[in-house]
Amino acid sequence: MDDNLLDGIITSPPYNINTERSDCYYNNGYSDLDGLSENDYLEVRTEEFKEFSRVVKDKGVICYNISYAKENPILPTLLITKIHNETDWTIADIICWKKPHAIPFQTSPTKLSRVTELIYVLVKKTELHTFKTNKEVSKVNEKTGQKFYKNYINYISAKNNDGYKCKLKATFSQELVTKLINIYFEKGSLIYDPFTGIGTTQLGCINNQCDFIGSELKEEHYSIAMSRIEEKLVSYV
């Protein structure tokens, strides 16, 4: 991939939960790929961000959805800290994604069902106050020139997923992708999802007139993604 190619990334990485889950009714669709040691997981994800530094434009944004799991709840915090300490990326915002349905089912005597997940908005440290967004100016103070913006909050309500039936259960929804694009990406932006899964990010890009690139290791998920994308593109012709 060329340097400075991408306007940004919208993705959700594997959560590293390749275990038999006693509090949930499914695996995440990556049972043969998602079982690294904690150190290996942190290293792999951090190395990915070092590569993102090369391919994402300086003012680009990464919307990174990662939730904790009962097996190792501290893992996302360790990862984001390592990314901040060892790469040129840092957190600009943290968005709370509210879903209509909570998981896992209430079978744990201690753990809460999660109805929200976090989306970390990461930008390059040199652009912490200058990265690109779609925030619209609502008014300007005539005396001082101070700009005031329409109200944008770090709380998004969106469906869990698109309801597509397949082995990959850990997916988000096109509705979520649309709401993130509306905040951070203008029409014609090139958005990458390095963990494409069944193509939800790409479908959201099509819906919002953005270009896209995706990567996917699992052939079954890739085939589903291509089928969904082709069907969506045909409907736009």
List the model feature ranges, each with a label.
Residues 1-224:
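Core catalytic lobe of class I
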Residues 226-237:
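Short, conserved SAM-binding/catalytic segment
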